[in-house]
Amino acid sequence: MTPTTKLLLLIAGVVLLGCSTGDPYVPEADPVLIRANRRVRAESELVVVETDDEGQRVFPNIENFLEGPRSALALYREEVTRDRVVDYFVELTGSESIALPILYYADRLDISLTLAFSLVWGESRFHPVAVNYNSRSIDRGLFQLNSLTFRHLTEDDFFNPEVNAFHGLKYLEFCLSQGEDEAQALAIYNAGLTRVVRGQTPTSTLRYVDQILGYRARLVADFESYILSQFPPTIA
């Protein structure tokens, strides 16, 4: 079974979020995800596949995708390159059960894949049962969701990669809408909106942002090398 097939099965079986409110959450029915999905699909550009004189497949416009601001997301949306993008992030996280929900919700919410995965690296190093105890609350799971902010989630919810990824990426979407750029959005994710907009961002948060952005830069470079090895623009 391919990763893409498992992704479809995973999504079909997701009836999870908001468990404590009574009704099951079905992601396909979420109006926010539906609107986002309609918006981003209209922007898709096709990867061009050609055959050279020796019968080798080449991808002459693959570098156009890699030069874009969110190359991994753009290539995830292309049928030709999608499976290889999935393979890359499954290898990165070490688990389909971790990578596939992040890919799914980042796509639906139009969030950069490299930003999303870098955030999870910074928060939990891709450990779905990671726990951090604060003085008055607990952070849990992949996106380290806070027990005070997400009071409606059960302990099982926090440690469920699908549930955690949805809530973490929805909160990141909010942070991106409030911040001036991705760096400020990460600061809001870590320290909260009030402290950041008041100019009271803690030094620890600034280090946190630098660490995640540094990891992301390395991730982008590695991803680009991987894609070029899988989809050569020309045959050397």
Q: For the regions a protein language model found, what residue spans apply to each?
A:
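Catalytic glycan-binding domains that act on GlcNAc-containing polysaccharides
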Residues: 61-236
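N-terminal secretory targeting signals
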Residues: 1-89, 220-236
